[in-house]
Amino acid sequence: MGRKKIQITRIMDERNRQVTFTKRKFGLMKKAYELSVLCDCEIALIIFNSSNKLFQYASTDMDKVLLKYTEYNEPHESRTNSDIVETLRKKGLNGCESPDADDYFEHSPLSEDRFSKLNEDSDFIFKRGPPGLPPQNFSMSVTVPVTSPNALSYTNPGSSLVSPSLAASSTLTDSSMLSPPQTTLHRNVSPGAPQRPPSTGNAGGMLSTTDLIVPNGAGSSPVGNGFVNSRASPNLIGATGANSLGKVMPTKSPPPPGGGNLGMNSRKPDLRVVIPPSSKGMMPPLNTQRISSSQATQPLATPVVSVTTPSLPPQGLVYSAMPTAYNTDYSLTSADLSALQGFNSPGMLSLGQVSAWQQHHLGQAALSSLVAGGQLSQGSNLSINTNQNINIKSEPISPPRDRMTPSGFQQQQQQQQQPPPPPPQPQPPQPQPRQEMGRSPVDSLSSSSSSYDGSDREDPRGDFHSPIVLGRPPNTEDRESPSVKRMRMDAWVT
């Protein structure tokens, strides 16, 4: 710290003057001591302060020094204040005192001002505190692939959809129904870069898009033509049904019991949901090959989906394509499609009956369990082999197709207002009735013959009203013509 120079004037402040006198007096005595030792001389200091107090310093005995002083006739050098000031002015110091060894102890008005300014600055710094962290505002577009061991949570069906992010996040944060062991955030997933959700088994992770930034079709957004693709986010479907027109359309189905999870109390914690977009987006993490579909360039082309959760309402899942390289432990033939009417309720497949039911009733669960059979476990390896030599839609024109649809709902969709016929085959025991369980997961398979069959059909059931899914409204000839079905099936499989 450099020594400061002060103006040599009388200090007006009494306290400051007293402090300065004490420190400078000691400094003067210290200088006299140094001079007496260094130069072998006798020094006597006599000081009277403003209150007439006497302070003295003598290098030896004061009386001896004073006696010598009185005997001395003419001093060799005698100086006063005016002489010192004149000498300093000649040296160019302009009346300012040279820095002393103890000048930093000086408490002049100028030093007091500086000390007060330093105190104010330090108080300002201390009160301001450390610089805060930047605010944690995560308003970003994210894609959250979640490998969920449990089923997809079914939020309150009567609640309205505030925002897609809110619905997806509320579904993901419900730890009682969904506990994701692996959660990966991908910021701003570009449509051009294919992504894969993480996988731990034969079925991949559930794809949950909070802001619907998911590759779809030819690289377009799921909201490509102004309509929300409800199939892109299973959380939105599970929360409010198919929000197919971008409006708030809460489902009228009663919420499933047991926290809204269909058959949750009796399921294994190994269920997986794979809902990737179409061929140019994400593919399931199974051993699947890319499907080049003719419908892949449409913004609302239905994706390649393997849904194994019962809480997805069917109106948002109208399937038009299946992957071609699933595990071929079981293959589905056209003769097995006639037995699908037995699988019409999620309560039919309890976990105690899954294994035996898969082995002995394979024809009943082959297509429906892969598409909407939420009760099937991960290791069941049910698959669909849609190679060119097998045509799924090669059943007869109308009657077996009626039997193929689940027990009453799909028949009513085709016949508009006709009462449903009784199911031709006995059903496995149901733990809960259909009215308590809400929509059956098989009802999500709207027709399997067209990717848009469920769009213009009227649901005459009183307990559920299906919202309209955006699609191409087919006419009656397109529904009933087997050639049209085969042409569509050939367009699916490549």
UniProtKB/Swiss-Prot annotation:
The modification Phosphoserine is found at S59, S98, S108, S233, S253, S345, S398, S440. The modification N6-acetyllysine is found at K247, K393. Residues 3-57 form the MADS-box domain. Residues 58-86 bind DNA. Residues 454-464, 475-494 have a biased composition (Basic and acidic residues). The record marks D174, S175, D211, L212, D453, G454 as: Cleavage. Residues 171-218, 238-268, 380-494 are annotated as: Disordered. Residues 171-181, 440-453 have a biased composition (Low complexity). Residues 418-432 have a biased composition (Pro residues). The modification Phosphothreonine is found at T302, T309, T405. Residues 380-392 have a biased composition (Polar residues). One of its GO terms (cellular component) is nucleus. There is a cross-link at K393 (Glycyl lysine isopeptide (Lys-Gly) (interchain with G-Cter in SUMO)). CDD domains: MADS_MEF2_like (cd00265). Constitutive phosphorylation on Ser-398 promotes Lys-393 sumoylation thus preventing acetylation at this site. Dephosphorylation on Ser-398 by PPP3CA upon neuron depolarization promotes a switch from sumoylation to acetylation on residue Lys-393 leading to inhibition of dendrite claw differentiation. Phosphorylation on Thr-302 and Thr-309 are the main sites involved in p38 MAPK signaling and activate transcription. Phosphorylated on these sites by MAPK14/p38alpha and MAPK11/p38beta, but not by MAPK13/p38delta nor by MAPK12/p38gamma. Sumoylation on Lys-393 is enhanced by PIAS1 and represses transcriptional activity. Phosphorylation on Ser-398 is required for sumoylation. Has no effect on nuclear location nor on DNA binding. Sumoylated with SUMO1 and, to a lesser extent with SUMO2 and SUMO3. PIASx facilitates sumoylation in postsynaptic dendrites in the cerebellar cortex and promotes their morphogenesis. It comes from the Eukaryota. GO terms for molecular function: chromatin binding; DNA-binding transcription factor activity, RNA polymerase II-specific; DNA-binding transcription factor binding; histone acetyltransferase binding; histone deacetylase binding; protein dimerization activity; RNA polymerase II cis-regulatory region sequence-specific DNA binding; RNA polymerase II transcription regulatory region sequence-specific DNA binding. Residues 264-281 are annotated as: Required for interaction with MAPKs. GO terms for biological process: apoptotic process; cardiac conduction; cellular response to calcium ion; dendrite morphogenesis; ERK5 cascade; MAPK cascade; mitochondrial genome maintenance; mitochondrion distribution. Keywords: Acetylation, Activator, Apoptosis, Developmental protein, Differentiation, DNA-binding, Isopeptide bond, Neurogenesis, Nucleus, Phosphoprotein, Transcription, Transcription regulation, Ubl conjugation. It is found in: Nucleus. Transcriptional activator which binds specifically to the MEF2 element, 5'-YTA[AT](4)TAR-3', found in numerous muscle-specific genes. Also involved in the activation of numerous growth factor- and stress-induced genes. Mediates cellular functions not only in skeletal and cardiac muscle development, but also in neuronal differentiation and survival. Plays diverse roles in the control of cell growth, survival and apoptosis via p38 MAPK signaling in muscle-specific and/or growth factor-related transcription. Binds DNA as a homo- or heterodimer. Dimerizes with MEF2D. Interacts with HDAC7. Interacts with PIAS1; the interaction enhances sumoylation. Interacts with HDAC4, HDAC9 and SLC2A4RG. Interacts (via the N-terminal) with MAPK7; the interaction results in the phosphorylation and transcriptional activity of MEF2A. This is Myocyte-specific enhancer factor 2A. The lineage of its organism: Eukaryota, Metazoa, Chordata, Craniata, Vertebrata.
